[in-house]
A protein has these predicted regions:
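Double-stranded beta-helix
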Residues: 177-182, 207-239
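A short glycine-rich, His/Asp/Glu-containing loop-to-beta-strand
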Residues: 109-148
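NAD(P)-dependent short-chain dehydrogenase/reductase
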Residues: 1-34, 68
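Short beta-strand His + acidic residue motifs that chelate non-heme Fe in jelly-roll/DSBH
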Residues: 147-149, 167-169, 195-198, 204-211
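A short beta-loop-beta micro-motif enriched in histidine and acidic residues
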Residues: 132, 144-157, 190-192
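Glycine- and acidic-residue-biased ligand/ion/polar-headgroup-sensing regions
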Residues: 153-175
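Mid/C-terminal beta-alpha module of Rossmann-like enzyme folds, strongest
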Residues: 23-26, 30-115
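Short acidic-glycine-tyrosine-enriched beta hairpin
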Residues: 173-201
């Protein structure tokens, strides 16, 4: 799969017990230091026993061929979908992904991204997740204002990593006296990287204050963009 070749699985339900190399090395080092784990065996199953006759590695993973194949397919598709599979700490998926990448050929290490460019600059999606949103990078040309919209449920965090800009936010609606809510101003710079949260129900923009340099902003959103349900409504911050 790392070489983009087809695989054949005759029985997806076949279960394997797999031991990751790092877990094996950790246990070997522990044994050398007198901290080994001991067991007895019932058939092929290790039963922990501090007085057991055998040393064993306690961390193994029971997975089916079908589960392995599905995970490998999701790893292979990541470069085209940008969706990072869930890889919790210590999980089989995390260990298998590291193993998969170690077999990746040189011509698959780098892959293209879609830059949505116009006269104002560009916007590029970098990475998506199923549970924790997506990461993008926005480039604004000198003097350009981007944004001027708000979201009902979506929220974002902006990180200016290069350039000098101004982020503005204003709560949608009016106060009890019928006045627009005040605009909040946050001056940002790549010389001092800070996190600015774009709140739900607040229209916001980002302005490149430089006359010569691009403004580069890394953006995290709590959900991946859905063209059918964009949850984006245009309203100027300074109306």
């Amino acid at each position: 799969i790392a070489n983009d070749l087809p695989i054949q699985v005759n029985d997806r339900n076949t279960e394997l017990e797999l031991l990751y190399i790092d877990d094996l090395i950790d246990e070997m080092i522990a044994a050398l230091e007198g901290r080994e784990h001991r067991c007895e065996f019932e058939d092929t199953t290790a039963v922990p026993d501090v007085n057991g006759r055998y040393c064993y590695a306690p961390v193994t993973h029971h997975v089916t061929l079908g589960e392995i194949a599905d995970l490998l397919d999701s790893f292979s598709e990541q470069s085209s979908t940008l969706v990072m599979p869930e890889i919790p700490h210590g999980s089989f998926a995390k260990k298998l992904y590291s193993t998969y990448l170690s077999y990746l050929p040189e011509d698959r290490i780098m892959y293209p991204l879609t830059m949505n460019s116009d006269e104002r600059g560009s916007f590029t999606e970098l990475l998506k997740t199923r549970a924790c949103g997506q990461i993008s990078v926005n480039i604004s040309k000198p003097g350009i204002t981007k944004g001027q919209h708000w979201h009902n449920s979506k929220w974002e965090i902006f990180y200016v990593v290069s350039g000098h800009g101004l982020i503005q936010e204003r709560k949608i609606g009016r106060d009890k006296d019928g006045n627009l809510y005040p605009v909040r101003n946050y001056e940002v710079s790549g010389d001092k990287i800070e996190a600015i949260q774009m709140l739900p129900g607040y229209t916001h923009n980002i302005i490149n204050l430089s006359e010569t340099e691009d403004l580069v902003t890394v953006m995290w959103a709590n959900e991946s963009f859905d063209r059918l349900h964009p949850d984006t409504f245009y309203e100027n911050v300074d109306d």
